[in-house]
A protein has these predicted regions:
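Active-site metal-binding loops of divalent metal-dependent hydrolases
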Residues: 134-138, 167-169, 200-202, 237-238, ...
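Conserved beta-sheet core of the metallophosphoesterase superfamily
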Residues: 186, 249, 288, 293-343
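Non-catalytic terminal accessory segments
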Residues: 1-107
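Binuclear metal-dependent hydrolase catalytic cores centered on His/Asp/Glu-rich metal-binding motifs
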Residues: 206-231, 243-287, 297
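Beta-strand-turn-beta hairpins that frame and shape the catalytic cleft
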Residues: 117-131, 231-232, 238-251, 282-286, ...
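Binuclear metal-dependent phosphoesterase catalytic core
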Residues: 1-7, 61-62, 66-67, 97-121, ...
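Active-site-proximal beta-strand elements of phosphoester/diester hydrolases
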Residues: 113, 127-140, 247-257, 288-292
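Membrane-embedded segments
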Residues: 107-112, 117-224, 229-232
Length: 343
């Protein structure tokens, strides 16, 4: 914004031009202040993230190209008169792409088929089909269940042996799970059932409930809603999947996340426990683990030889993905796709 202001001073821009360019940043700053002051509002979070995607990122692209072009022009003693136009062109392209992502892309469904192989997998589970869905964040769809029904139809069309959900059914409150969503998600079926674990949002800590008791009650309501849909919620526990005499252990933990600074008076739900989830599982058995945050995998899971495969969600590729690239790769070792540990 400073560079934009600096460039605008050279041109005859009226008051409304300044308002048009800087108002998004002011709105973003206001809601960012609310978030930093403890106003844990998903509405404010959406305003901040949406403004960054639609306005800040394109302006950043404009600034980098414009400033870089001017600096190179001075370095090589050339007058690049059209650099502002080039910068504006690329900024517009980025803005259009971002607009597509937050309007059309949010309802785009991709089915990724991944083959997991291991000589340790019981033979009866060769060809076993697991469908994983994650991070529905139902509050993002308000009362429109069309995309959720598309997801359900896609899942059922794959004829899975097992369906798993790896957390974040809601944004901040069980009130987001409207009856139409319950009806839709109740229609997912698989011979070995539908299992789920809780993600960080499912603990409802972002709603700003006034007490720990209310947070716990909200979390319990999320669990009951999932159970009412026919899902079995694994909270640091496991179940046995049996096929033709062979056994595969299905385990699930509550969210285990990277520690972060805690605000004064903030309630932080207890982390899930892999040890508790695998209590009683013999060393000879192998485990398919459900967890929410992939950070958990390298932190604890890879050191347990019983865990053969781990399924996680959470990252959303930071909501920005172009092919196999996402900025998430800069801050998350595991952000999407298949990863193999040599432990």
């Amino acid at each position: 914004d400073w560079w934009t202001f600096h460039e605008m001073r050279k041109k005859r821009i009226n008051f409304f031009g300044y308002v048009l360019i800087f108002l998004p940043s002011l709105v973003c700053a206001l809601h960012l202040i609310l978030l930093l002051c403890g106003e844990r509002s998903m509405y404010s979070f959406r305003i901040v993230s949406g403004t960054i995607l639609l306005f800040t990122v394109p302006k950043l692209v404009f600034t980098i190209i414009s400033a870089g072009g001017n600096r190179l022009g001075r370095l090589f003693h050339r007058d690049w008169k059209h650099i502002q136009g080039v910068a504006f062109f690329f900024a517009c392209i980025v803005a259009v792409v971002q607009f597509y992502c937050v309007t059309v892309g949010i309802n785009r469904l991709d089915v990724n088929r991944v083959t997991l192989a291991s000589p340790l997998l019981p033979k009866s589970f060769d060809g076993y089909r697991v469908v994983q869905i994650s991070d529905l964040h139902l509050g993002s769809y308000f009362s429109d269940d069309s995309f959720v029904r598309t997801v359900v139809d896609s899942v059922n069309s794959l004829h899975p042996d097992l369906i798993v959900f790896t957390g974040d059914l809601v944004n901040e409150s069980p009130d987001e799970v409207l009856p139409e969503f319950v009806n839709a998600l109740s229609c997912m079926h698989a011979p070995d059932g539908v299992y789920s674990v809780l993600g960080n949002h499912d603990f409802c800590v972002y709603k700003g409930f006034p007490s720990e008791q209310e947070v716990r009650r909200a979390t319990d309501k999320v669990v009951r809603l999932e159970q009412s849909m026919g899902w079995e919620v694994l909270r640091d526990e496991h179940r046995l999947l049996v096929r033709d005499g062979d056994t595969l252990v299905l385990a699930g933990t509550d969210n285990v996340a990277k520690p972060r600074p805690r605000r004064e008076g903030e309630y932080v739900p207890p982390a899930g426990s892999l040890k508790k989830a695998l209590r009683g599982v013999p060393e000879s058995h192998h485990v398919l683990l459900l967890t929410h945050d992939p950070w958990h995998w390298r932190r604890e899971v890879t050191s347990d030889p019983r865990v053969l495969f781990t399924l996680a969600g959470h990252t959303h590729a930071l909501h920005v993905r172009l092919g196999n690239f996402s900025p998430a790769a800069w801050i998350m070792p595991e952000w999407g796709g298949k990863y193999v540990s040599r432990n």
